[in-house]
Amino acid sequence: MRESGSLCAEIAFLEASPMLSSLLNVLWVVLGGLMMALGWWLAGLICAITVVGLPWARSCFVIGRFSLWPFGQEAVNRRDLRGRDDLGTGSLGLIGNVLWFLVAGWWLAIGHLSSALACFVTIVGIPFGIQHMKLALIALAPVGMTVVPVRNV
């Protein structure tokens, strides 16, 4: 039997359990995750059509997949994951993230933070609020990030 710990530790345990992650993901999709993912994918298509927005299009599609099925996944920097720089993690990625932040990132993060606060009001919504916090962080600076499964603890 596990010792009781902090709320964050409990949520991390839930995310590491594949069955609970799947159940929470299904609830997430039904309660708005599908619409959020479709919004991110639409933004990705718009960015791709402009050609100039191609670097951000990839990020929108990654975030869209993450926002569709967030439990059991986490966003990490590709440099930390691979141990080397690539186009999105070097100086061009930094410029891309600054431009993204100025144009759209902070608006999207505010939206996710507002949703997180609304979820935190209820006990049942706390796991969903934590997912909105994860999405707010990646929405601020998505270039150079990737989504990977949470490691079992």
What residue ranges belong to the model's regions?
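Juxtamembrane, membrane-proximal amphipathic segments and lipid-exposed surfaces
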Residues: 9-153
